[in-house]
Amino acid sequence: MDRIYQGEEALCIHNAATGRELKFPNIISKSKIKKKIVVVGAGPGGLEAARIAAERGHEVIVFEAAPDPGGQIRLCAKSARRKDMMGIIDWRMQQCIKKNVKFNFNIIAEAQDVINENPDTIIIATGGMPNLELFETKKDLDNVFTSWDIISGDVKLAENILIYDEAGDHTAMQSAEIAIEKGSSVEFMTPDRLISSEIMGMNLTPYLKNLQNKKITYSIAKRLIDVSIKGNKLNAVIGSDYDENFNHSSTYEQIFLNYGVKPLDELYFNLVSFSKNEGEVNYTKFINGETQNIIKNKNNKFNLYRIGDAVSSRNIHAAIYDALRLVINL
């Protein structure tokens, strides 16, 4: 509902067809030809692809590296504020089970694993991993953590920390809440002109209300340029997009990045040469939910696609919407 206060249409994170019913009906039609579909990844995008494919009447097999479905949603649901997000996964799992989707958990699928299933279509929905490469340095920082580390509880938090938020999404705010609850003093820094630019008002307000009078300071229009070790602390070089002469340093005990994710796309590229379409998508047809028809090598046996964060760092709705547009006429 946040979107309507910014002059946008009302959409649903859970159901990408909501608000788009004229183009994408909620009732999925059956396919005239039954196909075998392999989906790699059981996050929101992968499960939506599996659900719709099964509704279409296809045989569907899902590979998932983790022991449970959910992907990044399972991580975000660790925060009490967002625990209900698991409903996105639970409902899709229920629907997939009803339609006899086969799940293979605890398997890091290799190219040969999916090829051996003799599929007609392979959909890569493997998501991504936190990005540690600052644009300015062109290298991964090996002396920092990510916001995922705070939410998962994998890192013991120090007293004085920096959360650098380039993505502007819920993850950084969740991290700040958790860090403060555990006793840390937080500087929340963003290169943007306002904090959490991807969180709209109705959702941002509860975060800000909870963080009032807590040990947090907000630093806007400041960009993290580089990080180096200085004694037993970290030295952050800080600049600004608004003043090329602005440059100073600050020290912290720990630095956490919220910098989006890098696609886990190795499997996709390993499969490209074996596919009919060489992984290519007709984006005009994709946007309109029309059947893909690109054939680059007719001697190969399957078509290959990728969705969600396996393409580029985005959000839950984007992954689900990708799945809907790709599979609704598959």
What is the meaning of each model-derived region?
Residues 25-37, 161, 224-236:
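Surface beta-strand/loop "capping" patches
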Residues 15, 228, 237-241:
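Acidic/polar residues at beta-strand termini and the immediately following turn/coil
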Residues 2-5, 17, 97, 101-102, ...:
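Generic secondary-structure signature for well-ordered alpha-helical cores
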Residues 59-99, 169-170, 176-224, 311:
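Rossmann-like dinucleotide-binding cores of NAD(P)H-dependent redox enzymes
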Residues 1-33:
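Cysteine-cluster motifs in flexible loop/terminal segments that predominantly coordinate metals
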Residues 75-79, 118-121, 138-140, 201-205, ...:
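Short low-complexity, flexible loop/linker segments enriched in glycine and/or proline
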